[in-house]
C-alpha cells in the first residue's frame, strides 16, 4: 500500500485538466507495473492567483503614493478564493503588511489597529484610481 499527497497549482484551466489526467495515468501505470491498482482521489481547490501587470503596477504605484514601503514578493502561486474573481476579470491580489508578526493563518496572528485606517485609505485610493482607468 502506498499513499501520495500534494498540491498542484497552475494558471491555465486546460493545463490543470491535462495534469490531472497525467497524474491519474501515471498512478495507474505504476500500480499496474507492480501488479496492483491505483485509486486517485482528486480534490479541486481554487485556481492559482494570477495578478495582471496593469493592476499590479497600479497597486504598487498607489502604495508608493500613500507612503508605503513597496516590497517585491517572492513569486508564489497562492491558492485563494480571490482567484475565482480573477478568472472573470483582470485584477491584483496585494498584501498589506503591519510589521513583523506571525503570518495570517497562525494562531498568534494579530493586526496592529493603527494599520487599519492606513489600509482603508490605500484601498479607497486604489478604487478611485481603478474607476478612473476603466471609464
Residues of each region from the PLM?
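Metal-dependent amide/peptide-bond hydrolase catalytic core
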Residues: 1-135
